[in-house]
Amino acid sequence: MRVAIIDYGSGNLRSATKAFERAAREGGISAEIDLTADADRVRTADRIVLPGVGAYADCAAGLRAVDGMWEAVEDVAIAQSRPFLGICVGMQLMSERGLEKTVTHGFGWISGDVKEITPTDPALKIPQIGWNTIELRRQHPLFAGIPTGPEGLHAYFVHSYHLDAKKPDEILAVADYGGPVTAAVARDNLVGTQFHPEKSQALGLALITNFLRWRP
């Protein structure tokens, strides 16, 4: 099995690659973790990971700037229905639009727009940086075997925007940051996390392992 982590100049690429390598090694999973900027290698991968940090518009432009990459991601994730994981802004790009700086169109796989988080508590700063407990809205193989509650579902966030998903059945998990924040989304063979699995220690390692074993 080959897992393509897409390198388009955005995301915690080194730490993400090492986290996937560790998850495969410790989980006894035979997997080649391939950090690549080659669209052809993405097209032939068994599963793909799209990281991303920074502004939505910048990440969308960066991905489109890599020759054939936007189309390759759509081909693998939609036409071929292979497992896809979006991380942080990589998850946000699964949405219809991003409203940061300007209106930017995403892949349109998850209904809704990416909007600024607006906590009701003025003491809560933007961006949200640090640990937060997430709450599952439904069961999913991505979270199989992970204890519920603050001990198990403890994730690391760095963001000012979140995917305001329109369809409740596409919301997998939420966090409370002065109001509900979308923490994870899922549809068919597609999953995305607003938090960073590669920085989320036990939860992140378990989640990555589950993704590598997932057979949607």
Curated annotation (Swiss-Prot):
Record's protein name: Imidazole glycerol phosphate synthase subunit HisH
PANTHER family in alphabetical order: IMIDAZOLE GLYCEROL PHOSPHATE SYNTHASE SUBUNIT HISH (PTHR42701:SF1)
Organism: Mesorhizobium japonicum (strain LMG 29417 / CECT 9101 / MAFF 303099) (Mesorhizobium loti (strain MAFF 303099))
Chemical reaction(s) catalysed: 5-[(5-phospho-1-deoxy-D-ribulos-1-ylimino)methylamino]-1-(5-phospho-beta-D-ribosyl)imidazole-4-carboxamide + L-glutamine = D-erythro-1-(imidazol-4-yl)glycerol 3-phosphate + 5-amino-1-(5-phospho-beta-D-ribosyl)imidazole-4-carboxamide + L-glutamate + H(+); L-glutamine + H2O = L-glutamate + NH4(+)
Gene: hisH
Catalytic residue positions: 88 (nucleophile), 196, 198
Domain Glutamine amidotransferase type-1: 2-216
Function: IGPS catalyzes the conversion of PRFAR and glutamine to IGP, AICAR and glutamate. The HisH subunit catalyzes the hydrolysis of glutamine to glutamate and ammonia as part of the synthesis of IGP and AICAR. The resulting ammonia molecule is channeled to the active site of HisF.
GO molecular function: glutaminase activity; imidazoleglycerol-phosphate synthase activity; lyase activity
Pathway field: Amino-acid biosynthesis; L-histidine biosynthesis; L-histidine from 5-phospho-alpha-D-ribose 1-diphosphate: step 5/9
